[in-house]
Swiss-Prot record:
Keywords: Ribonucleoprotein, Ribosomal protein. The keyword Ribonucleoprotein applies. PANTHER family: 50S RIBOSOMAL PROTEIN L36, CHLOROPLASTIC, LARGE RIBOSOMAL SUBUNIT PROTEIN BL36C. GO terms for cellular component: cytoplasm; ribonucleoprotein complex; ribosome. This is Large ribosomal subunit protein bL36A. NCBIfam families: rpmJ_bact. It comes from Clavibacter michiganensis subsp. michiganensis (strain NCPPB 382). Belongs to the bacterial ribosomal protein bL36 family.
Length: 37
């Protein structure tokens, strides 16, 4: 899980979602998981 000031999609399967007021990237590849904060 990466914590970045700006989250971006890395591959085609990455999805940007809002969960509990935080922007997240979820993906099949665990290395692509990100959260904005």
């Amino acid at each position: 899980m990466k914590v970045n000031p700006s989250v971006k999609r890395i591959c085609e399967k990455c999805k940007v979602i809002r969960r509990n007021g935080r922007v997240r990237v979820i993906c099949d590849n665990p290395r692509h998981k990100q959260v904005q904060g």
